Structure formats: C-alpha cells, structure tokens
C-alpha cells in the first residue's frame, strides 16, 4: 500500500518537473499574453504542432488533470497547465534582481522565490481578466471555445470571485516588499486590467503587453535597493518591452486569419510582409538597451558574452522565421524562454566576475604598498 502511494507521489513529482523545470525536453508552452487574447493570453500551440510541443502540452496538462475535478477549471483558467507565460513574465524580474545583487554575490534567492510566486499569481489573474473580457470572442473561435468561461465550466461571477482570491494572494506577496516597491507594484494593476482591451482598438496590443509583462524589470531592483536607479532600470525595462514585441509579434502570426475574421488587431497584421525588418529593428533596440544596462551597472565580460549569444539567437530566430507557417512561429516563440535564461545567466556570471576583478585590484594595491 505504502509502496504504491510512494510510486504515485514520485510520478506526480516527475509530472511537475516535466511541466515547469527549464532544460528538460518537456518544455511547457502557452504564453498568456498577460491576458491572453484569442491571439494572446493563453497562447495555444498551432493546429498541428510538432510532436515535441504536443508532448510538452500533455505533460503540463497532467499536473492539472491530477487535481480534484472541481478544481481543474480554475487551474486552467489561470493557465497553470501552460507555464511558458509565467516564465516570460518572471524572467525580467530575475534580470533586475540579478543586477541589483552586490558585486561577487549570487542574486537574492528569497526575492527570486517571492517574485516567482507573484508571477504565477499575476499571470493567472491576467488570464482570468482576459477571459472575462473576451468570453464572447472565445466562443466564436475553435481554439478558444474550450476555455473554462467560454465553455460554461465557470460562470462570470465565479471567475470574478476567483480573480479576487488571486489578487488577494498577490497582494500578500507584494506586502512582503518595501513601501516603495508596494506602491510601484500596485501601479501595474491598471495595465493588467486594460491590456485585453487594446487588441480591440489598436494594432499595437503587443506594446501594451510589453509594458505590462516587463514591470518586474523595475520592481526587482527596487525590492533589493529600496528604489529604482533610472540609469539601469529604465533601459532594462525598455529592453524587455522590445523583447515582448519580438516574441509576441511572432506568435500573433499564428492567429492573424482568425483575428481578421473576428475583428481583432495585432502587430502581425500591422507589419504583414514587413515583419522581419520590424523585428530586426526591435532586436537592435533590445541589444542596445541591454548594452547600456551593462555599462551603467558596471557589468563584466560574461555579461557581454551573453549578449553576443542573445544577438545570435535573435538573428537565427528572425532569419529562419516563416511567418506563414504557424508551427514555425510557435517554435520560434517558445525558444524565447531560452533567450531570457541566457540573459539571466550572463547577469549572474558577470556579477560574480566583479569579485575576481576586485580581488585582483586589491592584490595589486597591496603589492604596491608593500613595495
């Protein structure tokens, strides 16, 4: 009896690892464009994804499927079975926390954990808000018709109560920070609420998503330092916005036909066949801003080496992109988690390298004094 329970528990842990841990073949998908429009919030895989993507979807969904049945619609409403959106929301936070670390030190693990929890909750809240706004649209699109609200699994009132619960928990996380960060974090709520409306009135909803999804680039630094340093935080925030414009425009090309039919707008429709030049421009702006971040924060060689890898990643991503093949757009889109992790790794190693340089400088000074 105990043996079977232990085996079941081990299988459950393995399912969680498949769904959430980076570096494993089971990379989960689905971005949630902060709120998840029919072409956003819950970024679903294309109609015919490659086998790899399909395996990832099943492994992530297994975590939700193992939950009590009455709970499952709520977990799907917050896209807990599709954690790629949480990663893309979380990574700019890690960049900021890493940059704020003391020279020669690793990032604050407590803050990384706290922001990870907040990312899960706020991404879920954003998806809930989006589905409440978009339930009439979702019913008309095959890909989104099975969302919990559109499918009738959860009523609008139930989703509203659930949203209140998520925001309450997120507030609890926010209250663990300093007063400056509490005020700064509260300021993002308006963006979270209004983003889903942007695709109705503007061809630039991806820009609104970028402003929303990268708020953590400001908040992470202030949580460590007590306030924002504009010389570091603003270019970091700008680089994140450019990054979002890149990956979300690529994703939007999967849904451009549906968007036209149901009257929604996106940068994919705005750029059309000129998408690659636009993405190239965003990439140059992103790398330029990250370079400025490095200069203003005194970064070292590993950081700039990581930027070189990011540049190569973006070049390959854009050069090989086929905007008319949904499966290719999907593969390019999900590769951006790797890109974000490269930036974070470069920040951590660059910061650790500062200690080595400082030690060498101190030894040099000591030798001069002795001589």
UniProtKB/Swiss-Prot annotation:
Widely expressed. Present in all of the tissues tested. Expressed at higher level in skeletal muscle, adrenal glands and the heart. It is found in: Mitochondrion inner membrane. Changing residue 78 to V: In MSA1; associated with disease susceptibility; decreased ubiquinone biosynthesis. Its cofactor is Mg(2+). Changing residue 97 to T: In MSA1; associated with disease susceptibility. Residues 105-108, 170-172, 225-231, 299-300, 354-371 are mitochondrial intermembrane. It catalyses: an all-trans-polyprenyl diphosphate + 4-hydroxybenzoate = a 4-hydroxy-3-(all-trans-polyprenyl)benzoate + diphosphate; all-trans-decaprenyl diphosphate + 4-hydroxybenzoate = 4-hydroxy-3-(all-trans-decaprenyl)benzoate + diphosphate; all-trans-nonaprenyl diphosphate + 4-hydroxybenzoate = 4-hydroxy-3-(all-trans-nonaprenyl)benzoate + diphosphate. Residues 1-34 form a transit peptide. The keyword Signal does not apply. It comes from the Eukaryota. One of its GO terms (biological process) is isoprenoid biosynthetic process. Changing residue 178 to S: In COQ10D1; decreased ubiquinone biosynthesis. Residues 35-83, 130-148, 194-203, 253-277, 322-332 are mitochondrial matrix. This is 4-hydroxybenzoate polyprenyltransferase, mitochondrial.
């Amino acid at each position: 009896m105990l043996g079977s329970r232990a085996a079941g528990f081990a299988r459950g842990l393995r399912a969680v690892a498949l769904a959430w841990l980076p570096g494993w073949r089971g990379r989960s998908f689905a971005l949630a464009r902060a709120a998840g429009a029919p072409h956003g919030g819950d970024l679903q895989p294309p109609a015919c994804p490659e086998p790899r993507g399909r395996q990832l979807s099943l492994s992530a969904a297994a975590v939700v499927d193992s939950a009590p049945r009455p709970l499952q619609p709520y977990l799907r409403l917050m896209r807990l079975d599709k954690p790629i959106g949480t990663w893309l929301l979380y990574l700019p936070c890690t960049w900021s926390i890493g940059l704020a670390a003391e020279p020669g030190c690793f990032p604050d693990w407590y803050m990384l954990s706290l922001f990870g929890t907040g990312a899960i909750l706020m991404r879920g809240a954003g998806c809930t808000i989006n589905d409440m706004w978009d339930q009439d649209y979702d019913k008309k699109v095959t890909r989104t018709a099975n969302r919990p609200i559109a499918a009738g699994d959860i009523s609008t009132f139930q989703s509203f109560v659930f949203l209140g619960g998520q925001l309450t928990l997120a507030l609890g996380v926010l209250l663990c920070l300093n007063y400056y960060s509490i005020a700064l974090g509260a300021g993002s709520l308006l963006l979270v609420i209004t983003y889903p409306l942007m695709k109705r009135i503007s061809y630039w909803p991806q820009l609104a998503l970028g402003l929303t999804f990268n708020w953590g680039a400001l908040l992470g630094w202030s949580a460590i330092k007590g306030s924002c340093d504009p010389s570091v935080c603003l270019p970091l925030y700008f680089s994140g916005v450019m990054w979002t414009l890149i990956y979300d425009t690529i994703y939007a090309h999967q849904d451009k036909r549906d968007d036209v039919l149901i009257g929604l707008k996106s940068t994919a429709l705005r750029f059309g066949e000129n998408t690659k030049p636009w993405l190239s421009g965003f990439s140059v702006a992103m790398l330029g801003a990250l370079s400025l971040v490095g200069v203003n924060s005194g970064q070292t060689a590993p950081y700039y080496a990581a930027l070189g890898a990011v540049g190569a990643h973006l070049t390959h991503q854009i050069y090989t992109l086929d905007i008319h093949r949904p499966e290719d757009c999907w593969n390019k889109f999900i590769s951006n988690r790797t890109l974000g992790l490269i930036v974070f790794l470069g920040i951590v190693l660059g910061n650790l390298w500062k200690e080595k340089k400082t030690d060498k400088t101190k030894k040099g000074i000591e030798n001069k004094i002795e001589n």
